Amino acid sequence: MEKRRPHYDLIQAELHCIEALSLTVTARHGIKAIGMTLGDVLQVIQQLSMGNFYKSMTAQADSRVWQDVYHSQWKGRRLYVKFQKHEKYFIVSFKER
């Protein structure tokens, strides 16, 4: 299922410092492949706006879990950024589009 408005509000407030980033292994690999630091990741997250929002969709493994997808840029590279709420932390997925 998909929708055209974010499921989660205030992602920037939840992810306000490097210590707040909770990353999947896939996200860590994507960040490393792009050549980003965690500081770069945090900067991208803090600069996201509704103009970057792409879609919300349910997770393949569990249709009750929503994921918000944003498109952004970093140093001329187009990024696909996905957030998912799990307990009290967001899991962040980064990859090049």
What is the predicted role of each segment?
Residues 10-64:
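Compact soluble domain cores
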Residues 77-80, 84-97:
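Enriched for short, Lys/Arg-rich terminal
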Residues 1-4:
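Intrinsically disordered, low-complexity and often Lys/Arg-enriched segments
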Residues 60-84:
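Basic/aromatic recognition patch in beta-strand/loop cores that engages polyanionic ligands
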